[in-house]
Each structure stands twice: as structure tokens, then as C-alpha cells.
């Protein structure tokens, strides 16, 4: 087998206007670099070669308008084949293609397509039709584009669905993580509160013990004088109302004097004296008055009025 550069020869020598014919060149590789240097070659014929794949940089030949890849051994097209947005005519007759890349839907300029003699997927084969004449090949291009757009839309929906599933899964995971973090925060908060409460109780207990220790010496000092005082003889309580006692004693003394004078005036020889005569008269009147209860009634009346 021959490499692309050898039997391809000087590509400029094969260029006829805008057409470049590399058919029947026994190529097993596409000379992409040489082709990229010929942007005028908008019509490229690579039919009847031994190509099994197209390199990804082949899709950079966006100047291509007509491309003939018939009668090769292509099993698949590059994933970004849709970059050939100026392509209008595409011949894929007699290859080994089963499916087309989803990007095929981006070939909006495609007007003609031939997919005969390929082991196509049954659905794609039915869409493509027979391509027996010009009209059917044009219909094939239109129908395949519509089909690939539908496939692309389905894949996009599936991609969005998977993205949504992934987002939902991520949201659930994030919610689970937030719940876990909240639970951990709550646990730490509760532990901190319990630790604070424990320390507060210890502090209160320490203060209470300190207060008890401060009270004990006071009790001992209060009890010590009591014990000493119990051993000593009790002192008589101080006299109160000393002045009242003096007045009372004076009154008693006066009464004794009066009583003594009265006795002397009544019993002794002094009763004949003028002073004793007056005293005896007063005494007799007083006795008579008491007997008539006048003084007693006067006292009672005075008490009732008060």
C-alpha cells in the first residue's frame, strides 16, 4: 500500500480549476496538509482508494463544496464531520458505514447524498432510501438531514435529562451534606452548652463551698465567748429606772414619817399640842370620809371619766 504523499504526487499538478482528482490513487491516508494548502480545490474526488478512516483534521477543510468518497473502506466518519458546513454534494457509495455522526445534522448546505451499498442501520437505511437517481439522492440528503436533526435533538434531550439527573443527584448530595453539617453543628452546640452548664455548676459549687468555709470561723468565734461566759458567774442585770426607784423610796420615807407623826400625835403626850390637834382633826375627817365612801366614789367616777 502507498502512503498519501507518494502516489498523491504534486497535488497542484492534479488541480484543474477548482477540481482536484485523487481517485484511483491507491491512497490509504488522506493528505490533509497538502489539501489545506489548496483552498481553491472546492471539489475533491477521493473515490476508489483504500481509505478506512478520515483524520479529525480532515474536517478543517471547510472550503469543500463537493466530496466523493465512494468505493473506499470507510467504517465511520469523524465525530465533527459537521464542520464541513459548505458541503453540498457528498458521495459515500459502497463503503462500510453503519451509522453517521450526530454532527451530520449541521451540514445545512447539503443538497445531494448517496449512501447506497453500505451496511446501514435499518432505521437509517429506510430514511436514506435507494438513491437510484438524481431526484432520490436529493431526497436522501433532505431526509437524512432531518433524521439526524431528530437524532441530535433526542441526544440533546437525553443529555439534558442526564444533566438534570446529575444536578438533582448533586442537589440531594449537597442537601445531605448540609443536613449532616447542620447536625454536626447542632451536636457541637449542644456539647458546648452542656460543657458550659457543667462548668457553671462547678463554679457555683465552688462558690458555695467557699461561702461555707467563710461562715465556719464566724460560728466558732460566736460560740467561743458563749462557752467562756457560761463558766463565769452571771452578773446581775443592770438596774433600770434608777430614778423611779429613788422617787418611790422617797415617797415611802415620807409615808413612814407621816405615819410616825400620826402615831405620835395620837398616842403620846404630844396630842395636846396645836400641831397634833390639827393632825388628829385631819385624820378623823379622813376616816369619816372613807367610811361614807365619798372618796372611793370620787376615785371611781374619776376613773370612769378617764
Swiss-Prot record:
- Key word Transcription regulation present: no
**Basic residues bias: where?**
229-241
Give UniProt keywords alphabetically.
Acetylation, Coiled coil, Endoplasmic reticulum, Leucine-rich repeat, Membrane, Microsome, Nucleus, Phosphoprotein, Repeat, Signal-anchor, Transmembrane, Transmembrane helix
Residue numbers of N6-succinyllysine PTMs? 73
Q: According to the UniProt entry, which residues carry N6-acetyllysine?
A: 135
Q: Which domain of life is it from?
A: Eukaryota
Q: Where is the composition biased (Basic and acidic residues)?
A: 175-221
User: How does this protein sit in the membrane?
Assistant: Single-pass type II membrane protein
User: Which sections of the protein are LRR repeats?
Assistant: 10-31, 40-62, 63-84, 86-107, 109-128
Transmembrane segments annotated in the record for this chain: 245-265
InterPro entries tied to this protein? Leu-rich_rpt, Leu-rich_rpt_typical-subtyp, LRR_dom_sf, LRR_domain-containing
Coiled-coil residues are 152-216
PROSITE patterns in alphabetical order: LRR (PS51450)
The entry describes its oligomerization and partners as: Can form homodimers. Interacts with SGO1. Interacts with FGF1.
Task: State what protein this is by name.
Answer: Leucine-rich repeat-containing protein 59
Q: Which gene encodes it?
A: LRRC59
Amino acid at each position: 500500500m502507498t502512503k498519501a504523499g507518494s502516489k498523491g504526487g504534486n497535488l497542484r499538478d492534479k488541480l484543474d480549476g477548482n477540481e482536484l482528482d485523487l481517485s484511483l490513487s491507491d491512497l490509504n491516508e488522506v493528505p490533509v496538509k497538502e489539501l489545506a494548502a489548496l483552498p481553491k480545490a472546492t471539489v475533491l474526488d477521493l473515490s476508489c482508494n483504500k481509505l478506512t478512516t478520515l483524520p479529525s483534521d480532515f474536517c478543517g477543510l471547510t472550503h469543500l463544496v463537493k466530496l466523493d468518497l465512494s468505493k473506499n473502506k470507510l467504517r465511520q466518519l469523524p465525530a465533527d464531520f459537521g464542520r464541513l458546513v459548505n458541503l453540498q454534494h457528498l458521495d459515500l457509495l459502497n463503503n462500510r458505514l453503519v451509522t453517521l455522526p450526530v454532527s451530520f445534522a449541521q451540514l445545512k448546505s447539503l443538497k445531494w447524498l448517496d449512501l447506497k451499498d453500505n451496511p446501514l442501520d435499518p432505521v437509517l437505511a429506510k430514511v436514506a432510501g435507494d438513491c437510484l437517481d438524481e431526484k432520490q439522492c436529493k431526497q436522501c440528503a433532505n431526509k437524512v438531514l432531518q433524521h439526524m436533526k431528530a437524532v441530535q435533538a433526542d441526544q440533546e434531550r437525553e443529555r439534558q435529562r442526564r444533566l438534570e439527573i446529575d444536578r438533582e443527584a448533586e442537589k440531594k448530595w449537597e442537601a445531605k451534606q448540609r443536613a449532616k453539617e447542620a447536625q454536626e453543628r447542632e451536636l457541637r452546640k449542644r456539647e458546648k452548652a452542656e460543657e458550659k452548664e457543667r462548668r457553671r455548676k462547678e463554679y457555683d459549687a465552688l462558690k458555695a463551698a467557699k461561702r461555707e468555709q467563710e461562715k465556719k470561723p464566724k460560728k466558732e468565734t460566736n460560740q467561743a465567748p458563749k462557752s467562756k461566759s457560761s463558766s463565769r458567774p452571771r452578773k446581775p442585770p443592770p438596774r433600770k429606772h434608777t430614778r423611779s426607784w429613788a422617787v418611790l423610796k422617797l415617797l415611802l420615807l415620807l409615808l413612814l414619817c407621816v405615819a410616825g407623826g400620826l402615831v405620835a400625835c395620837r398616842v403620846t403626850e404630844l396630842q395636846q399640842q396645836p400641831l397634833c390637834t390639827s393632825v388628829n382633826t385631819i385624820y378623823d375627817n379622813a376616816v369619816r370620809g372613807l367610811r361614807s365612801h365619798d372618796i372611793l366614789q370620787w376615785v371611781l367616777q374619776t376613773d370612769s371619766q378617764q
